[in-house]
Regions:
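Ligand-binding loop in jelly-roll beta-barrel domains
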Residues: 175-199
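Glycine- and acidic-residue-biased ligand/ion/polar-headgroup-sensing regions
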Residues: 133-136, 142-158, 165
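Short beta-strand His + acidic residue motifs that chelate non-heme Fe in jelly-roll/DSBH
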Residues: 42, 138-140, 159, 177-183
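Short Cys/His-rich Zn2+-coordinating modules
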Residues: 13-23
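Positively biased amphipathic helices and basic secretion/translocation or surface-docking motifs
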Residues: 1-8, 22-23, 33-36, 40, ...
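A short glycine-rich, His/Asp/Glu-containing loop-to-beta-strand
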Residues: 104-140
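Sequence/structural segment immediately N-terminal to covalent heme-attachment motifs in c-type
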Residues: 28-32
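Short acidic-glycine-tyrosine-enriched beta hairpin
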Residues: 158-178
Length: 213
């Protein structure tokens, strides 16, 4: 597997520091399961962070800090498998959300050749799996915020490039594109957005609003 497009360094560092949202952390962890280069970057960042913490002088805790810490430890949290490598069709970090078989997911059809499945992540950012048959494409759109797309099976292309398994495309509000699935097998992507997409055309706008895109 030759991965060409990687998450930005800022995203990797936020993940390493535990500062990324659940949806973004899931996308990065899934990419790491497929990419040894980025695993090394994150490992170095985590090691550097540990060294910095070891050099920090201790300070007195505020009143109630211990009780607050216990409350946070008791709070439920999603199990994102960090540092795991992919050993099957579904990368390890995704399995707690969808199981081990993409074919068993309860896909929802939104347009001819396109279906999606929403992942139950917390926070503002939303994570979805998008399944597109060869030749089909998501309607032309721009972005109110940022969108990150990780290819899990197949591939897709747009005016900005070609994306294969393991590749991550980062799209900002200035990016206008129409991703189209490549010939061959179905393209399944993990897409994370921190704001709604802006579709062109009346029908795509209506469909996007109905399905929460």
């Amino acid at each position: 597997m030759s991965i060409v497009h990687h998450p930005g360094e800022e995203l990797l560092l936020a993940y390493a520091a535990g500062a990324a949202s659940e949806a973004v952390s899931l996308l990065v962890a899934t990419h790491l399961a497929l990419c040894s280069d980025c695993r090394a970057v994150v490992a170095d960042a985590e090691a550097a962070g540990g060294s910095l913490l070891a050099d920090v002088a201790p300070v007195a805790l505020e009143q109630g800090a211990y009780r607050s810490l216990l409350a946070r430890l008791d709070a439920p949290a999603a199990e994102i498998v960090r540092g795991a490598r992919s050993t099957g069709d579904v990368p390890a970090p995704l399995r707690p959300y969808v199981g081990g078989d993409f074919a068993r997911i309860g896909w929802r059809r939104i347009a001819p050749g396109i279906a999606y499945f929403s992942l139950p992540t917390k926070g503002k950012a939303r994570a979805r799996l998008i399944r597109t048959v060869p030749g089909a494409g998501v309607a032309t759109h721009t972005h109110r915020g940022e969108e990150w797309t990780l290819v899990l099976t197949g591939g897709y292309s747009d005016a900005n490039g070609n994306y294969r398994v393991g590749d991550v495309q980062s799209a900002t509000p200035d990016i206008r594109h129409k991703p189209v699935a490549d010939p061959g097998s179905a393209c399944i992507n993990l897409a994370v957005t921190d704001a709604p997409l802006v579709f062109e055309g009346l029908l795509p706008k209506i469909v996007g609003k109905i399905f929460g895109f």
